[in-house]
Amino acid sequence: VDSAAAVASFAPGTHGEPFTVEALLQNCDDTEMGPSCTFYAEGARWVASFGYKSNDAALEYMKTLPVNAPMIVSGDQISMGDITVEAAVSKAEPGQRDAYADQRDAMQGDWVDESDAKSTLRVVGSEETASYDGQQTAVSVLGFADACPGGDSIGPVVWKQEMGGDPMDTPCFALLAVSPTRMELSYVGRGNTLVYVRP
């Protein structure tokens, strides 16, 4: 790790509301904001652009990491949309794997609904793309916790928030079983179980 990545490049509050979050790397790529790194923390999608207020050494460090790598990221919030935060990253360093890392890892990749082969999911990092008969239907952010938003602790759950959807609409599923070959989710509040297998 370039030591400059872990040294704050500006004082907290320089560019907006300061933050320090435990984050998961999504990717570093060209986005709607130019070359940038995207990470997930606290249920939001955070985007930091190269050459714009951030510590580029910290973003270069992110570029070396695999998807879902845990990080501790500090900086300032420049602006916030529905679920996307434009961030100025001051520093980034390695974080600890969280309690849901194994389930998150097992969920990565392509899945087919056992009861309807036209219904598919692709999980990459903290993003899930749902498709039906080859047509993309939704892209959602996945969050892992031991309780649904506003609910009781019931053990590991995954909640989904559709990008561009209602921020209050977060369907939540109990993780009944997640292995590299099979995923069983129970829709909390509706009770139906969804089973996905590998294609």
Enumerate the language-model features and the residues they cover.
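A general sequence property marking short-to-moderate contiguous segments
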Residues: 1-8, 69-71, 75
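Structural detector for short beta-strands of small beta-barrel domains
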Residues: 2-40
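N-terminal helix-cap/turn-to-beta initiation motif at the start of protein domains
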Residues: 14-16, 62-64, 92-112
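Extracytoplasmic
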Residues: 16-20, 32-34, 68-70, 106, ...
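Contiguous, well-ordered beta-strand patches that form the walls/edges
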Residues: 24-38, 42-60, 114-122, 129-198
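Short nucleic-acid-contacting surface segments enriched for D/E, G, S/T with interspersed K/R
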Residues: 56-73
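Short, charged beta-turn/beta-strand-edge "cap" motif at the junction between a beta-strand
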Residues: 76-81
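Edge beta-strand at a domain terminus
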Residues: 84-105, 186-199
